[in-house]
């Protein structure tokens, strides 16, 4: 997909350009999915009333409060805006919050008894994370209005005057005012360290900051002063799961006080200092818990149930069921819009957003219940790319239950033709706040009708993303004969990422080119590409390129120096190439794909999403997927064999079936010297989203667009006088039914061999030789651990360069 924002990590020459995710607010995906507040189906961000009798929290897009000893939960806000991050004023009269309205994040306030919401900020830059001064006259908040990332500002509530408070390099977030009102705590980067920063303090009257505590964090710390001002409660990931920890305000060794295998977040000390509230994801969605200030195991927690509830507007219940054409229950992705314009998800569900279209969704196994504002409710059910979306509208009556059934009918039955859709690049845990289990993960894939989900365990910074023990080389026990989930590995190097699927053991280390670690040097992909093959698996290229040539008439080889793919392919390595991926641009990736094919390399076209299924602001697995034509019953081995043979196409949504003289993608068509120069191309396209055009590609030359909106089947001829390859692709506009940026599908070619000779484009070979030179120019000053390591890497560069020089018939000018 085309990235709207790019986050450049220019830490050294060994660090590649990392593209950011689809952006609603104009920031990287990491910021938008981890720093920014999220819509949750359970309680989040608890905040005590000053007298300790109430706890405010956010849930389902509103601010609620509940007696701290338990009882009825009362909503203080209602749509159409979403409300998050409540902060109870020290005088007890008001609750400030972050609000999402008009496509932006702002700070607002409401009476602690509910009522009219007052929007306090309306700058075009995002404002969030409000924290009160001790006299309840000012709000400290985080904003991008400084133009250099996130800084901390102070807003005087009476006249809305805003003044800067902390404007250091990097992002300053999560402000908290000391009990005596004299010191501000916040989170800010620590030079030379990974993560989003440590806990700092700064006198509000002026003075230098003091680093209290550092650990590799991901916008999760949210420090809160204890009432005596002597310590901070904060969220720690040092033990491999998010836990509440306590550290002295003057610095020192922290203690973890909620050591549970799942995650605990957003600790808030009670006003008397005897206990603290927090949220836990041990059951999946957030639950509200209270524990003694000294912490303790699960048995010492007091669960605060959120029910009964008193909403701010009349509500009703919707009971919905999704079925197939025969009436059998069917898992699906669900999108709803209520009468207030907001999206809702069932209690206990996982509310998520496809950021590229700002579409809210959740997954359902079949039946689900929704408590929503009275009035018309629009519901849509989707299931992958082979079923037509089903939509309906129901009129929700106050206090009543409405029953609705959505029927999903097939657009095409690809498995009946031997084609099975899978994802080469899904993920598991990635620091999201939802308590993702194997069951939840599998149910996501089932609802998306993914027949093979390759879940890649990887490393982000120095932290493992996933569960070490999941990589067994066997399908997960939840798998069925038609829908398989199997864990695999991703190597995240500074010059591209390698996916290893169908493997039994890890190829280590999991990372390379990571500054401030023992693996800061550039790493070769070859051990990973070879390591997967040695185990009987496949290794391929994830999210290859983020953009097409800036000047197609005179492409610059240096633009393509961020990936080792041209080196690896020249060395005979690599089993597949994800033309479609959320974290790359399909047209840009296709441009390099065609150049590699034009040098005689046979590389299957595939698709892999690179989604994070426990993160709320991310698309589902199978957003980008690979269709492989399997011989015999579906299994991991048969699907991988089909990919290896190139019987594939990659897609963001459209299904495209190609034959050339009756041959299918990955096949070879041998023609004699006297055979006709023209071959017959047949293409059939089916798509749940609009598509504009079909294009036939011959030896890298994209043919004239063929309109297919009303004629999904095409038959014609193309000329291949010198042999080479013939492939097809389909392109369409953005669509709410496409979770990537636009509709796109690319087949693997049918390879045409005329008179026994392989077609090679000398121009493309020369260009790729230049790309290899550019890669070495980028990496030659990497912090190599030894001269031998540098020499070994350079030898691979030289070997790849020699391949392209040979294919070009010599250097440029030959």
Regions inferred by a protein language model and the residue ranges of each:
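Sequence signature of WD/YWTD-type beta-propeller architectures
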Residues: 20-317
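Catalytic cores of extracellular degradative/oxidative enzymes
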Residues: 417-605, 609, 615-616
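Solvent-exposed, polar/charged alpha-helical surfaces in well-ordered, non-transmembrane soluble domains
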Residues: 53, 74, 118, 255, ...
């Amino acid at each position: 997909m085309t990235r709207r924002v790019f986050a450049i990590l220019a830490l050294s020459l060994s660090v590649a350009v990392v593209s950011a995710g689809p952006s609603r607010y104009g920031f990287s995906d990491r910021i938008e999915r981890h720093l920014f507040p999220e819509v949750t189906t359970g309680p989040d961000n608890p905040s005590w009333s000053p007298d300790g009798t109430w706890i405010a929290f956010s849930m389902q897009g509103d601010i609620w409060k509940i007696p701290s000893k338990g009882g009825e939960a009362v909503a203080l806000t209602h749509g159409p805006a979403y409300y998050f991050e409540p902060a109870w004023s020290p005088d007890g009269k008001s609750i400030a919050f972050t609000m999402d309205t008009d496509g932006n994040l702002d700070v607002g306030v409401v009476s602690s008894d509910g009522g009219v919401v007052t929007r306090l900020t309306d700058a075009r830059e995002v404002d969030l994370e409000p924290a009160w001064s001790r006299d309840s006259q000012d709000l400290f908040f985080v904003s991008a209005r400084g133009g250099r990332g996130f800084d901390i500002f102070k807003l005087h509530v009476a006249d809305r005057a805003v003044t800067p408070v902390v404007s250091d390099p990097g992002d300053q977030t999560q402000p908290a005012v000391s009990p005596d009102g004299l010191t501000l705590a916040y989170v800010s980067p620590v030079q030379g360290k990974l993560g989003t920063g440590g806990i700092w303090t700064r006198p509000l009257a002026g003075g230098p900051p003091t680093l209290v505590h550092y650990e590799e964090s991901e916008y999760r710390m949210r420090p809160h002063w204890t009432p005596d001002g002597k310590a901070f409660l904060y969220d720690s990931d040092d033990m491999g799961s998010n836990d509440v920890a306590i550290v002295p305000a003057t610095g020192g060794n922290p203690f973890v006080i909620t050591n549970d295998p799942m995650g605990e977040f957003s600790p808030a000390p009670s006003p008397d200092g005897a206990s603290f509230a927090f949220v836990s994801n041990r059951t999946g969605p957030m639950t509200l818990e209270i524990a003694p200030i000294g912490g303790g195991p699960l048995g010492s927690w007091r669960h605060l149930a959120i029910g009964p509830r008193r909403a701010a507007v009349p509500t009703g219940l919707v009971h919905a069921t999704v079925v197939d054409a025969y009436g059998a229950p069917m898992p699906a992705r669900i999108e709803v819009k209520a009468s207030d314009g907001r999206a809702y998800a069932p209690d206990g569900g996982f509310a998520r957003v496809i950021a590229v279209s700002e579409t809210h969704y959740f997954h359902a196994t079949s039946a689900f219940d929704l408590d929503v504002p009275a009035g018309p409710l629009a519901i849509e059910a989707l299931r992958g790319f082979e079923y037509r979306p089903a939509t309906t509208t129901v009129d929700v009556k106050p206090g009543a239950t409405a029953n609705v059934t959505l029927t999903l009918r097939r657009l095409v039955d690809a498995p009946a033709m031997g084609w099975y859709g899978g994802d080469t690049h899904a993920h598991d845990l990635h620091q999201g706040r939802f308590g993702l289990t194997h069951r939840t993960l599998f149910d996501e894939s089932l609802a998306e009708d993914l027949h093979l989900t390759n879940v890649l365990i990887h490393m982000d910074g120095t932290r493992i993303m996933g569960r070490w023990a999941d990589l067994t080389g066997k399908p997960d026990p939840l798998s069925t004969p038609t829908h398989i989930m199997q864990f695999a590995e991703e190597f995240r190097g500074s010059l591209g990422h390698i996916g290893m699927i169908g493997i039994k053991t890890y190829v280590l280390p999991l990372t390379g080119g990571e500054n401030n670690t023992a693996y800061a040097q550039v790493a070769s992909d070859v051990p990973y590409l070879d390591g997967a093959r040695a185990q009987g698996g496949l290794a391929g290229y994830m999210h290859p390129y983020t953009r097409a040539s800036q000047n197609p008439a005179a492409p610059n080889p240096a633009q393509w120096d961020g990936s080792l793919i041209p080196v690896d392919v020249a060395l005979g390595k690599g089993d597949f190439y994800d033309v479609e991926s959320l974290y790359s641009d399909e047209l840009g990736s296709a441009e390099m794909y065609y150049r590699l094919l034009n040098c005689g390399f046979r590389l299957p076209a595939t698709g892999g999403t690179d989604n994070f299924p426990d993160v709320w602001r991310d698309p589902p697995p199978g957003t980008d997927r690979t269709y492989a034509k399997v011989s015999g019953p579906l299994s991991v081995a048969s699907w991988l064999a089909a990919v290896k043979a190139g019987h594939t196409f990659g897609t963001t949504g459209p299904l495209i079936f190609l034959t050339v003289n009756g041959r299918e993608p990955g096949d070879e068509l041998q023609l004699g010297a006297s055979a006709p120069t023209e071959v017959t191309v047949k293409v059939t396209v089916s798509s749940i989203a609009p598509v504009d055009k079909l294009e036939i590609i011959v030896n890298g030359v994209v043919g004239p667009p063929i309109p297919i909106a009303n004629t999904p089947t095409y038959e014609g001829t193309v000329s291949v006088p010198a042999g080479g390859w013939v492939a097809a692709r389909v392109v369409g506009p953005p669509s709410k039914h496409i979770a990537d940026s636009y509709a796109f599908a690319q087949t693997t070619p049918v390879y045409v061999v005329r008179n026994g000779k392989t077609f090679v484009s000398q121009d493309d070979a020369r260009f790729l030789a230049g790309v290899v030179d550019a890669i070495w120019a980028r990496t030659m000053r990497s912090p190599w651990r030894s001269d031998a390591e540098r020499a070994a890497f350079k030898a691979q560069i030289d070997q790849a360069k020699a391949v392209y020089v040979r294919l070009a018939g010599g250097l440029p000018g030959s």
